[in-house]
Amino acid sequence: GFGCPNNYQCHRHCKSIPGRCGGYCGGWHRLRCTCYRCGGRREDVEDIFDIFDNEAADRF
């Protein structure tokens, strides 16, 4: 599920998505891969990938 709890695999997964520069594992037991847009501003985090259903949930 998008590599979490391994930050490196999550980051690589996010970089493969157009418009995303990376990602990190967070949430309960670090099982959620959160991707961020290029620019690195915290409020630009948009897509959250959950290891349980592997679907993107739009935050906005």
Swiss-Prot record:
Disulfide bonds: 4-25, 10-33, 14-35, 21-38
Induction field: Its expression is increased by bacterial challenge.
Tissue expression pattern: Abundantly expressed in hemocytes.
UniProt xrefs under Pfam families: Defensin_2 (PF01097)
Biological processes annotated in GO: defense response to bacterium; innate immune response
Subcellular location: Secreted
Gene3D superfamilies linked to this entry: Knottin, scorpion toxin-like
Pro-piece positions: 39-60
Cell membrane keyword on record: no
Modified residues (Cysteine amide): 38
Post-translational modification remark: The hydroxylation of the Trp-28 is not important for the antibacterial activity.
Family: Belongs to the invertebrate defensin family. Type 2 subfamily.
Role noted for this protein: Active against both Gram-positive and Gram-negative bacteria but is not cytotoxic towards human erythrocytes or protozoa.
Annotated protein name in UniProt: Defensin MGD-1
Organism: Mytilus galloprovincialis (Mediterranean mussel)
Gene (name only): FH3
